[in-house]
Amino acid sequence: MVKVNVIFHSIHGHTYKMAEAIAEGAREVEGAEVEIYQVPETLPYEVLEKMGAIETKNLFAHIPVVTRSMYEDVFAGADALIFGTPTRYGNMTAQMRTVFDGLGGLWSRDALVGKVGSVFTSSGTQHGGQESTILTTHVTLLHLGMIIVGLPYSETRQRRMDEITGGSPYGASTIAGAEENRQPSENELAMARYQGRHVTQIAKKLIG
């Protein structure tokens, strides 16, 4: 059995939909046990309400929120960890950063060394920092000792030129639009499924 956990942060639901697609692809691998978690939201209700995010947050309210008491099971207990975060100025969101910053105890005893790590993202525009967000998140994964897996060009959908689409060798991504009203396309969701499957296959090989 290979255990894969998908951990995401989402406000308007785009990263959540990609997370579901990632998990769907991971579950296609025989013997895979896949769970999805969301990180705690740090924005107050009033701010989320002004952002028009209450309704969209409710769409994935059923997804468990990963708390510090769960870090051992969710992080140290997995063979592969796939992280999803929207872009914030070319980096992960503060909500996701807070979770990573809380992993010091696991880091200090090398609990994540040798585990497979992968990242996916979303942004408001085509050039909204998708690649830099994934790459800067990779830096954190490297400090934790993880083995990074991206989205290889064998997933040919990232080569498409006939439509606006996310996706790069660094990981799957989606473009939400400036008003957050564009939903992940089938092409983007297919790349997310590929990434989930690819990461899980590699993790399965590594654990023998």
Curated annotation (Swiss-Prot):
It catalyses: a quinone + NADH + H(+) = a quinol + NAD(+); a quinone + NADPH + H(+) = a quinol + NADP(+). The keyword DNA damage does not apply. GO terms for molecular function: electron transfer activity; flavin adenine dinucleotide binding; FMN binding; NAD binding; NADH:ubiquinone reductase (non-electrogenic) activity; NADP binding; NADPH dehydrogenase (quinone) activity. FMN binds at residues 10-15, 87-89, 122-128, 143. Keywords: Flavoprotein, FMN, NAD, NADP, Nucleotide-binding, Oxidoreductase. One of its GO terms (cellular component) is membrane. Substrate binds at residue 107. This is NAD(P)H dehydrogenase (quinone). It comes from Methanosarcina barkeri (strain Fusaro / DSM 804). The lineage of its organism: Archaea, Methanobacteriati, Methanobacteriota, Stenosarchaea group, Methanomicrobia.
